[in-house]
């Protein structure tokens, strides 16, 4: 708790429960898990393009990156999210200045699910990226970088 000066959490919530159906797809390395995560990770605008970088396809780039993951990596990631139960207690122990960067249209970790987490940090600031989904660093990388620099 005392070794860190600044903490930034991007696209977070508590709890981060993951559905059994998605966990089962990921456990069996079913491509459907990647399809669901890709779809749910982006805002509606990002799903149909809207990339600030011409020629880049956000959703397909994300899908391809996940397809390159080693076996069970996605499952273990989702399981860790789902099994993490001490988030509020851990937040109370943080003495560092904390910044949460949340997406307005985040379907995986909706901003209203961060409310209890926010209330348990001692020194917290929240930045919301309008129109962005869970993939904040892909959908709006420059604004995320600006917020990270502010936090330092």
Model-identified regions with their sequence ranges:
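Core-facing hydrophobic residues within beta-strands of well-ordered domains
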Residues: 3-5, 124, 132
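Conserved alpha/beta-hydrolase catalytic His-Asp/Glu region
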Residues: 15-18, 24-93
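Hydrophobic "lid"/C-terminal helical patch
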Residues: 78, 117, 144, 148, ...
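Short beta-strand/loop motif that positions the catalytic acidic residue
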Residues: 94, 100-102, 106
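Conserved alpha/beta-hydrolase "acid-adjacent" motif
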Residues: 107-113
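Catalytic histidine-centered segment of alpha/beta-hydrolase-like enzymes
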Residues: 108, 132-145
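Active-site-adjacent alpha-helix of alpha/beta-hydrolase-fold enzymes
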Residues: 115-124
């Amino acid at each position: 708790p005392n070794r860190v000066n600044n903490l930034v959490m991007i696209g977070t919530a508590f709890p981060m429960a993951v559905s059994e159906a998605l966990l089962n797809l990921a456990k069996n390395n079913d491509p459907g898990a990647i399809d669901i995560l890709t779809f749910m990770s982006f805002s509606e605008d990002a799903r149909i393009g809207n990339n600030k970088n011409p020629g880049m396809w956000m959703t397909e780039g994300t899908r391809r990156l996940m397809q390159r993951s080693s076996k069970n990596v996605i499952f273990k990631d989702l399981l860790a999210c789902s099994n993490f139960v001490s988030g509020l207690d851990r937040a109370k122990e943080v003495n560092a200045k904390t910044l949460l960067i949340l997406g307005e249209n985040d379907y995986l970790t909706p901003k209203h699910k961060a409310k209890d987490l926010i209330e348990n940090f001692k020194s917290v600031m929240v930045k919301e990226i309008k129109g962005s989904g869970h993939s904040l660093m892909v959908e709006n990388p420059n604004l995320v970088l600006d917020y990270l620099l502010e936090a330092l």
